[in-house]
Amino acid sequence: MSQRVKKLTGLVAATFTPLTAEGEINLSVIAAYVDYLIEKQNVKSVFVNGTTGEGCSLTVDERKHLAAAWCQHGKGKLEQLIVHVGCMSIKDSQELARHAASIGADGISVISPSYFKPINADALRLFIKEVSASAPDLPMYYYHLPGMTGVALEAADVLNGIEREIPSFQGVKYSGTDLRDLGQCVCYSQSRDWSVLYGVDEQLLGALVLGVHGAVGSTYNYLGHIVNQMLSAFNNGNHTQTRDLQFGFMEVITFARTLGFDVSVNKQVMSEVSGLPMGPPRLPLLPCPVSKAQAIAQKIHNFTQGL
């Protein structure tokens, strides 16, 4: 990768995957989805086919169609489109990486395999390297999500020396809660001009203090405009406003968790707040009762109306 890469910063929406009532991907929603993120949330970068998007429950072909639709409708509108290509099979990940390059994605990301797990950081780096080699001109971001993968490796150990093996490596989507490990990632990335994006939405303020460059999350699909205010307040040194916004955000998430806040609930909340038909989740996730999502949406409305 020879050309200079535009650094990935700010808010990145981890997109949901719209499905029809029959459980098929619904590409007709994507164009309006792009406009909603930009016009209503002021969020101009996306992370497609990740956890929020139920990527690991989709077929390779479905993931290709979704990525292509986001590229098609986001062209000239979105600042950056990162495609998650992680799979249990390295061959599938490589195929998705090549496809992402062919459609003009701005970068790719890969999560650790979680059935046959890498036994150490060297093994995981090798996996990332072989996926990246299928799209060597695309920036590569490691997706660290130990809570879902069960891979108990520290991200800082994975990053150590990775630039010597993967010239296109550009950073990490850190979706763990270990702030010490996160801080080490930020420290290591500083001299390399990489991006460290935080992925635990309700703890963003702590990550900002450590120096992360932005955040990737599901709630930025419908609370991005509020979190953008928080980022502005933080960057302007208004720590009281930043903290108050974070506390309000935490209150919403805490309320949602009392009702059970998994991907299926979050997806229905997105439908309620945005008006876009996200549809049901894919099994084994079960549909969310509308009343539960409406209660969370009302909590979000109350929070945002006071700002």
UniProtKB/Swiss-Prot annotation:
Gene3D superfamilies, sorted: Aldolase class I
Active site (UniProt): 143, 173
Main location per the UniProt record: cytoplasm
Entry's EC annotation: 4.1.3.3
Disulfide bonds: none
Pathway this chain belongs to: Amino-sugar metabolism; N-acetylneuraminate degradation
Catalytic activity line of the entry: aceneuramate = aldehydo-N-acetyl-D-mannosamine + pyruvate
SMART domains tied to this protein: DHDPS
Matches recorded under InterPro entries: Aldolase_TIM, DapA-like, Schiff_base-form_aldolases_CS
Family annotation (Pfam families): DHDPS
GO molecular function (one): N-acetylneuraminate lyase activity
Entry GO CC: cytoplasm
Domain of life: Eukaryota
Positions annotated to bind aceneuramate: 51-52, 175, 199, 201-202, 218
Family to which this protein belongs: Belongs to the DapA family. NanA subfamily.
Assembly: Homotetramer.
Role played: Catalyzes the cleavage of N-acetylneuraminic acid (sialic acid) to form pyruvate and N-acetylmannosamine via a Schiff base intermediate. It prevents sialic acids from being recycled and returning to the cell surface. Involved in the N-glycolylneuraminic acid (Neu5Gc) degradation pathway.
Protein known as: N-acetylneuraminate lyase
Gene name per UniProt: npl
